[in-house]
UniProtKB/Swiss-Prot annotation:
Coiled-coil ranges per UniProt: none
Gene name of this polypeptide: pth
Protein name: Peptidyl-tRNA hydrolase
A UniProt-annotated Pfam family: Pept_tRNA_hydro
Signal peptide segment: none
Catalytic activity: an N-acyl-L-alpha-aminoacyl-tRNA + H2O = an N-acyl-L-amino acid + a tRNA + H(+)
EC number(s) reported in the record: 3.1.1.29
Site (Discriminates between blocked and unblocked aminoacyl-tRNA): 9
Primary enzyme class: hydrolase
Family matches, as CDD domains: PTH
Length: 187
């Protein structure tokens, strides 16, 4: 079984913000799998499905970004999911918009959701799908304001293709392994 975690913040005011692209990616993946039923457990919205006969649990922590590990750690323990079967999808300001990077065992890069998960798991040895949201064009815009801001109209126009590519990357990680997936999808 695999655990696919999309990071974001709960609540309508955050729904279409850059910081919630992890939630958006999980929603897109679940939609492609027929929208499996969602349960509220482990301080998260979770759903079970299969990706090409591989059982997966989708998770959207409802704890706010900085406490995401409070959902991930107990969920992994309950289902006995090993760290090598954890994929965390999150926003990445150091990647240009619509680019992505698959990495394993890397630092948190200042991302508070990753800090929370790594801190509670006691390890960074899990796969991350870093979805590029870019940096603010105006250097006077603070990063927190930028990531909590909504995507531009131009970015929204590219979103279906970007999320489809993210879904393909998750499938490739599961079916082909991180090395092949990284070679194919890292931009």
């Amino acid at each position: 079984m695999w655990l696919i975690v999309g990071l974001g913040n709960p609540g309508g005011e955050y729904k279409l913000t850059r910081h919630n692209i992890g939630f958006m990616a999980v929603d897109f993946l679940m939609e492609g799998l027929g929208n499996p039923p969602i349960k509220n457990q482990f301080k998260a919205e979770i759903a079970q499905a299969k990706i090409k006969d591989h059982p997966v649990i989708f998770c959207k922590p409802q704890t706010y970004m900085n406490l995401s590990g409070e959902s991930v750690q107990p969920l992994m323990g309950f289902y006995k999911i090993p760290l090598e079967r954890l994929i965390v999808i999150h926003d990445e300001i150091d990647q240009p918009f619509a680019q992505m990077k698959i990495q394993k065992n890397r630092g948190h890069g200042g991302h508070n959701g990753i800090k929370s998960i790594s801190g509670l798991m006691g390890s960074m040895d899990y796969t991350r799908l870093r979805l590029g949201v870019g940096r603010p064009a105006n250097p006077n815009i603070p990063v927190p304001d930028y990531v909590l801001g909504k995507f531009t109209k131009e970015e929204f126009a590219q979103m279906p293709d970007f999320l489809n590519k993210a879904g393909d990357a998750v499938e490739s990680i599961i079916l082909d392994g991180i090395q092949k997936a990284s070679t194919k999808f890292n931009t």
